[in-house]
C-alpha cells in the first residue's frame, strides 16, 4: 500500500471535491474537510490544504484526478524507512495477567545505524532477556512516549456496561501515546500503527477521545517487521509489560505467566483460593475466559 501526501490550493480542492462527490465517505477526524474512497484508495483532504491518498492505487488515482504528483511532499510504501517516522505498538492485550503497554517512538533515518548495531527487530522474535538488555538503551536514545494501563484500571474501563471494549481501549491508548509524543515537538513525515483493527473502525472509536492530531495514519499488519520505529516501540512496550508482570507477581507472591493458556488458568485458581477475586481484579483482565476456567478448577 502506498501513501501520497500533497499540498493543494483552494481551486484544486474545489475541483477535487466535485470529481469525488459520488465517492464521499464520512470521517470522524475533525481536521478532515473532505473524505472519499475510490478504486480502493482512501482520499483525505485536510482543512490545512494537505491531501492524503492511501492505497495500492494511490499513484494511478492521482494521475486520474490530474493531481500535481511532482509536488508530492513525500511518497512512501508501507515499508519505507527513509523519512522520520513515529511508530506505535502495544503489548499485553493477549495476556490474561498483566496490563497493556503502549509505546510510540520517533525514529529518524540518522538513528538507523544505532538501531541496526543493536540488532533491533520485531520484539516477538527476540528473547525476553535480549529485550530487557536492549530496551533501556532505546529508552535513552530514542524519543518515545510510554503508557501502561494496569489490570486494575483496565477492569474499571473494559467490559459490559463500561466505557470501553478490548478494541476501543487500544485505540485510546495508541492515540494518547502518539498525541503526547507530538506535544514534545516531534515532527514525523509518517505515523505508523501496527494494525489491530480496520482504519474505519479505529476512526469510529477515536471519535469519543478528547485529544486529536491532524497527522494522517498508516495502518499495517505486522508493522514491527517492516518499520524500525514500530520495532523500537514493540521492544520498549514488551519490556514495560514484563516489568509490570514481574511486579504484580512479587506483590502477590506468585510467578504470573504471560499469555492466556492453561498455565494462566492454574495460577489464577491458586490466587482465587489464596486471596479471592480481588487478587484477579488487581492482576488480570477479568473478561478473559481464563477467569471462568480458574473458578471451575476450584470446584474439582
Swiss-Prot record:
UniProt cross-references to CDD domains, sorted A to Z: RNase_HII_bacteria_HIII_like, RNAse_HIII_N
Does the UniProt entry include the keyword Hydrolase? yes
Transmembrane residues, as ranges? none
The residue ranges of the RNase H type-2 domain are 83-300
Q: Look up the record and name the cofactor or cofactors this protein needs.
A: Mn(2+); Mg(2+)
Entry's cofactor comment: Manganese or magnesium. Binds 1 divalent metal ion per monomer in the absence of substrate. May bind a second metal ion after substrate binding.
Q: What is its EC number?
A: 3.1.26.4
Respond yes or no to whether keyword Magnesium is given for this record.
yes
Put simply, this protein is called: Ribonuclease HIII
Amino acid at each position: 500500500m502506498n501513501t501520497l501526501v500533497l499540498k493543494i490550493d483552494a481551486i484544486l480542492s474545489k475541483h477535487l471535491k466535485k470529481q469525488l462527490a459520488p465517492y464521499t465517505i464520512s470521517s470522524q477526524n475533525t481536521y478532515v474537510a473532505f473524505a472519499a474512497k475510490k478504486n480502493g484508495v482512501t482520499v483525505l483532504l485536510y482543512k490545512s490544504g494537505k491531501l492524503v491518498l492511501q492505497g495500492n492505487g494511490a499513484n494511478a488515482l492521482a494521475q486520474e484526478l490530474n493531481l500535481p504528483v511532482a509536488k508530492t511532499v513525500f511518497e512512501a510504501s508501507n515499508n519505507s524507512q527513509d523519512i522520520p517516522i513515529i511508530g506505535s505498538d502495544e503489548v499485553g492485550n493477549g495476556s490474561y495477567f498483566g496490563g497493556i503497554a503502549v509505546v510510540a517512538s520517533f525514529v529518524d533515518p540518522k538513528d538507523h545505524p544505532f538501531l541496526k548495531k543493536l540488532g533491533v527487530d520485531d520484539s516477538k522474535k527476540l528473547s525476553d532477556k535480549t529485550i530487557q538488555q536492549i530496551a533501556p538503551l532505546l529508552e535513552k536514545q530514542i524519543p518515545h512516549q510510554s503508557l501502561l494501563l494496569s489490570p486494575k484500571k483496565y477492569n474499571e474501563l473494559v467490559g459490559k456496561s463500561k466505557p470501553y471494549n478490548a478494541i476501543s481501549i487500544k485505540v485510546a491508548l495508541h492515540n494518547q501515546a502518539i498525541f503526547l509524543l507530538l506535544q514534545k515537538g516531534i515532527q514525523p513525515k509518517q505515523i505508523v500503527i501496527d494494525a489491530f483493527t480496520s482504519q474505519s473502525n479505529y476512526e469510529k472509536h477515536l471519535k469519543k477521545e478528547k485529544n486529536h492530531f491532524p497527522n494522517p495514519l498508516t495502518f499495517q499488519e505486522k508493522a514491527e517487521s517492516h518499520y524500525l520505529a514500530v520495532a523500537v516501540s514493540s521492544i520498549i512496550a514488551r519490556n514495560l509489560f514484563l516489568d509490570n508482570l514481574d511486579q504484580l507477581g512479587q506483590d502477590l507472591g506468585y510467578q504470573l505467566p504471560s499469555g492466556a493458556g492453561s498455565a494462566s488458568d492454574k495460577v489464577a485458581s491458586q490466587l482465587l483460593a489464596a486471596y479471592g477475586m480481588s487478587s484477579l481484579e488487581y492482576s488480570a483482565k477479568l473478561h478473559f475466559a481464563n477467569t471462568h476456567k480458574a473458578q471451575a478448577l476450584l470446584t474439582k
